[in-house]
């Protein structure tokens, strides 16, 4: 809250305490009922690299992560409460591929959060809530900067509450 305005915001917290606050820029229809738009892409320099932040609907727009990538972010964090099914599977292909490209089914083949990392040579962390009864299906994940590297550098959590991790190496993202 600032004055009489409310914002959909998230904080980046590190060992030193609060490193910064990001205010959501792209508001969906539900947000517009109570929140004002943020007006600045936020990123924070940390010991592990430059971290950018998005919230939910921001990540639908490729330009959001692109701006953070152009600001030199190594990692983008996106907290979300996105409803519905927004990833789709692929049944596989009979077309032969060079090793190690997989040809079998992939339930998360069409996942634009996976692509946000690859579009911008960044690690992309997407954290969504799980509440199946109210149409929140989770589909959280940590996605590496190269969607064409196999096996993929990623860690997915489907429709369950869980904690997962992926070792993130930001030392060579400039190439």
Residue ranges of predicted features:
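Short hydrophobic-aromatic micro-motifs
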Residues: 50-55, 76-78
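Alpha-helix N-cap/helix-start capping motif
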Residues: 16, 58-59
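A short C-terminal boundary segment appended to hydrolase-like catalytic domains
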Residues: 168-175
């Amino acid at each position: 809250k600032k004055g009489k305005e409310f914002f959909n915001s998230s904080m980046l917290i590190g060992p030193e305490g609060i490193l910064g606050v990001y205010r959501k820029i792209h508001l969906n229809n539900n947000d517009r009922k109570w929140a004002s738009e943020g007006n600045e892409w936020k990123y924070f320099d940390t010991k592990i690299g430059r971290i950018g932040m998005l919230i939910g609907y921001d990540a639908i727009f490729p330009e959001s992560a692109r701006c953070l990538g152009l600001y030199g972010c190594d990692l983008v964090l996106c907290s979300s409460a996105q409803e519905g099914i927004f990833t789709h599977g692929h049944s596989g292909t009979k077309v032969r591929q060079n090793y190690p490209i997989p040809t079998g089914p992939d339930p998360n083949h069409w996942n634009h959060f996976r692509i946000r990392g690859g579009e911008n040579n960044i690690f992309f962390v997407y954290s969504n809530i799980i509440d199946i009864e109210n149409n929140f299906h989770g589909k959280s994940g940590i996605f590496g900067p190269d969607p064409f590297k196999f096996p993929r550098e990623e860690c997915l959590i489907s429709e369950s509450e869980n904690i997962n991790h992926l070792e993130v190496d930001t030392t060579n993202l400039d190439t």
